[in-house]
Each structure stands twice: as C-alpha cells, then as structure tokens.
Amino acid sequence: MKLRHLLLTGAALTSFAATTVHGETVVNGAKLTVTKNLDLVNSNALIPNTDFTFKIEPDTTVNEDGNKFKGVALNTPMTKVTYTNSDKGGSNTKTAEFDFSEVTFEKPGVYYYKVTEEKIDKVPGVSYDTTSYTVQVHVLWNEEQQKPVATYIVGYKEGSKVPIQFKNSLDSTTLTVKKKVSGTGGDRSKDFNFGLTLKANQYYKASEKVMIEKTTKGGQAPVQTEASIDQLYHFTLKDGESIKVTNLPVGVDYVVTEDDYKSEKYTTNVEVSPQDGAVKNIAGNSTEQETSTDKDMTITFTNKKDFEVPTGVAMTVAPYIALGIVAVGGALYFVKKKNA
C-alpha cells in the first residue's frame, strides 16, 4: 500500500512539475498564509481600529488543459486581520489563512485562484494594495483518505518570487495652532487660554493619545506634551507662540476654542489655512468643527486691541495743533517772501 502511495505521489509531482513557479513560494499542506504589512509614514502614528479583508476566488481566466483547472470555490472565501489602537511599535505585521482542506476536489490537478484585498472598510489615511496574486493549489491523490486533497500551494505575483504579502501605508497629519496679537493696545506678553477637543470615532477610541509640541519665543527647543482624544486639552499661547499636533490621525473631527476676551477690549479673528487649500476666516474665538485630512492644517488666532484717544484729551490738544499749523504756515510764507 505504501509503495503504491509513493508511486502515485511521485508520478503526480513529476506531472505537475512544469506548473511550479518558484520554490521559494511553495507551502506544504492545505493552508495558504496571507501576510499584511501596515507601514507607518509617521512612526508615532496611531493605528486605527479596523479590519483588512482578503478574498480568494477561482481564476476564471485559466484555460483548462490536462491537469490545469479553474479553482473550486471555498466555503469561506474571505479572511481578515484585525488592528486596534493598541497595536504599536513592532506589531504592524499580521497574517491570515485560507484553508483548502474544506474544499472537495473531484480529481488531482493544479487548481488556480486569485487573491485580492477587499476595500470593505476604507479607513481615512490608509492606502490600499491593489495587487492580485495567483495561487496554484496542487491536489494529489491521498491514499489514506481515498480522495484528492490539497497537498501543497504556490502563491505568487507575476514576475515575482515573493510570497503573498499585501502592503498598506498609514499616513497621519499635523495641526498647528498659532497666536498673533496686534494693535496699539495688544499685550504681547499675555498668556491667552485655549482648548482643543479631538473627537473619538469608530477608528480611534477615547483616551488614545496624540503628541503635541509647543514652540515659544526665543529659540528654545519645543516642549512636548500629550493630549487625549475626547478630553479637553488646555493650553496657553503668547504672541508668536504655537502648538503642533504632530501625529493627528486623518479623519478625526476637532474644535479649537480660545477664551472670550471681549471684556478686555480684544476682537478675535480665526484664520483656518489647510495646506494647498482655500483660507477660511471666522470672526470669533472658535473654529467650526473641522475634520483632519491628509493635508497639514494651520489655524491662526489673532487678537487685536487698539487704544482710543480720550475725547477730552483730543479737545484739549486740538487748539494747540491748530496754532502749530498756523505758525508753520506763517514761517513758510515769510521765508518764501524774503527769498523773492
């Protein structure tokens, strides 16, 4: 019995040898491993709560000939890997499997499939891999089970020796809040109070932290702090100072508000300036609800205060100004006449 099994297996391997693509991609057994690699453009980027889904389906473009067949549909044609906000550091590579042991093959041969990444949940800031991989499932007669079974698998991309690996990149953005004080009465040394609220969503949960750098006047190194999503972050800025959220996730809603300084005779204007976008001006002390994009954002709060000259002082000074003008005019007339 064993001799017969070996002879059959050897014959099958010889028959299918012409269809083997690269030895580096061969997997023994009935399970195909798919690797997902999430590259962080910003090493401090928050990883979203999301799934990446892969689909395998019969390759209907195959011309069936001899031992070459279109694949047989799997009972479970979809598999996925899951990422959460807790995935940090070196945990950005994950794997999933397709199991061909559940498939009933009618006869030995090489069965062809295609594996792709599905864009079921398209996360803002994530670029998706559009590669389509070819999978060859080599089905041999199994003497013990008395039926054809998946014995080894070859997965590859045309012209490549690498195994099936889908690569995605995750980008983050920056949000800069600047302070400007103008006018003859504006206090350039005053600390103005602000609040920043980042709102949680399905991808980024409350209490997850982003990094903030505060730049002050004088050329000192930026001071680094953290802000939590869904918690009001308080900060102060003087004229010429700023804060920058350095790893703001794309697709997060936020609001920046300054305290109301009308009682101190300040008028406030907010300038919202997206990178490569249209500038928006808001009369008031708060932004509208903004949504972060893959373009960096700069928001400038300008507080203006001018001193008014008291009416009494103006009335008292006015006669002297008039007399001065008359005196200067008379002097000029005298000089001009003398020269004539």
From Swiss-Prot:
Organism: Streptococcus pyogenes serotype M1
Modified-residue entries (Pentaglycyl murein peptidoglycan amidated threonine), positions: T311
Keyword Secreted: yes
Site (Autocatalyzes isopeptide 179-303 formation): E258
Keywords recorded for this protein, A-Z: Cell wall, Fimbrium, Isopeptide bond, Peptidoglycan-anchor, Secreted, Signal
Covalent link location (Threonyl lysine isopeptide (Lys-Thr) (interchain with T-311)): K161
Identification of the protein by name: Pilin
Motif EVPTG sorting signal mapped to chain: 308-312
Residues of the propeptide: 312-340
Function: Major component of the pilus. A stack of the pilin subunits, joined by intermolecular isopeptide bonds, forms the pilus. The pilus is required for bacterial adhesion to host cells, for bacterial aggregation, and for biofilm formation.
Cross-link Threonyl lysine isopeptide (Thr-Lys) (interchain with K-161) mapped to chain: T311
GO terms under cellular component: extracellular region; pilus
Subunit structure: Forms columns of about 3-nanometers in diameter of head-to-tail-assembled molecules.
Localization per Swiss-Prot or TrEMBL: Secreted, Cell wall; Fimbrium
Processing and modification events after translation: Proteolytically processed and assembled in pili through a transpeptidation reaction catalyzed by the sortase C1. The last pilin subunit is cross-linked to the peptidoglycan.
Stretch forming the signal peptide: 1-23
Secreted in keyword set: yes
Membrane topology according to the record: Peptidoglycan-anchor
Source taxon at top rank: Bacteria
Annotated site (Autocatalyzes isopeptide 36-168 formation): E117
UniProt-listed Pfam families: DUF7601 (PF24547), FctA (PF12892)
Cross-link (Isoaspartyl lysine isopeptide (Lys-Asn)): K36-N168, K179-N303
Main localization of the protein described in the UniProt heading: secreted
